[in-house]
Regions:
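Active-site helix of classical SDR
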Residues: 124, 131-138
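Alpha-helical substrate-binding/gating segment
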Residues: 161-168, 182-204
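Conserved C-terminal active-site "lid" loop/helix of NAD(P)H-dependent oxidoreductases
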Residues: 170-172, 204-231
Length: 243
């Protein structure tokens, strides 16, 4: 049993995944500006409050960092504070408190500059096309540095398109390509549980795509299978509650 802190636990991804480690006997501590009435116990804390993050990180075995501005937005007004400073606060609190494992939410938008029908492997590299994706490239770089320099075990999860609302699901459906990078709520929960439970040696850093099945698969599933023993079960529109 592990103690697992989840930042952004009341957000779209957080609400989809927090139940799974609880069901498997882990102790989950939610951390979100919104007070979540679910079992994860988010209490209105903000990742921009370093002291609050530091206090919450004490005694944790794993931190899943989801809290962020979740879409493209004005870089100076909307993205820098949560996606850059907030990320630093979480990573540095993990270091200060001796949290051995850090799981960082990255994004499929990092490969948006590749052709829309291309099968993308990690070695093909990141090709962001907006500032939101750039903040997630920063997150991957920070995760690698904290693993190498400070000995944390770090997974950067390049998350597929997980619908956060009915409108978001309809946008995915109508996009012409979103179903090929779809990540269901159910598969996301299974993926993050695998991340929590996998044994990793100190100072190890991995980038892993997280997606569901697709008629035309775009994201290489091999790292998730090899590192986590994760295999997707759903295909669009399975595993999401909206449409």
């Amino acid at each position: 049993m592990s103690k697992v802190m989840v930042t952004g636990s009341a957000g779209g991804v957080g609400k989809a995944i927090t139940h799974k480690p609880i069901q498997n006997g882990h102790e989950v501590r939610g951390f979100d500006r919104a007070i979540n009435t679910r079992e994860d116990g988010a209490d209105g804390s903000d990742i921009l409050d370093y002291r609050a993050v530091l206090k919450a990180a004490s005694g944790q075995d794993v931190i899943i960092h989801l809290a962020a501005e979740p879409d493209e937005a004005d870089f100076l007004d909307k993205l820098i504070e949560p996606n850059v400073r907030g990320l630093y606060n979480v990573c540095d609190a993990a270091r200060q408190q001796g949290v051995p494992k850090l799981i960082l939410a990255s994004t499929v938008q990092l490969i948006a500059g590749h052709p829309k029908d291309a099968f993308v492997r990690l070695e093909d590299g990141a090709r962001p096309i907006n500032h939101y994706a750039l903040t997630k490239l920063w997150a991957e770089g920070m995760g690698e540095m904290y693993a190498r320099a400070y000995g944390l075990s770090v997974i950067a999860a390049r998350l597929g398109w997980l619908p956060r609302s009915r409108e978001h699901a309809e946008e995915l459906r109508d996009s012409g390509w979103g179903t090929n990078v779809y990540l269901s709520h159910n598969d996301a929960a299974r993926f993050f549980l695998k991340c929590v439970e996998v044994e990793m040696e100190p100072a190890r850093f991995e980038i892993i795509f997280a997606s569901s099945k697709a008629k035309k698969l775009r994201l290489d599933p091999e790292p998730a299978k090899r590192i986590l023993d994760y295999e997707a079960e759903d295909i669009w529109p399975e595993g999401q509650p909206f449409i």
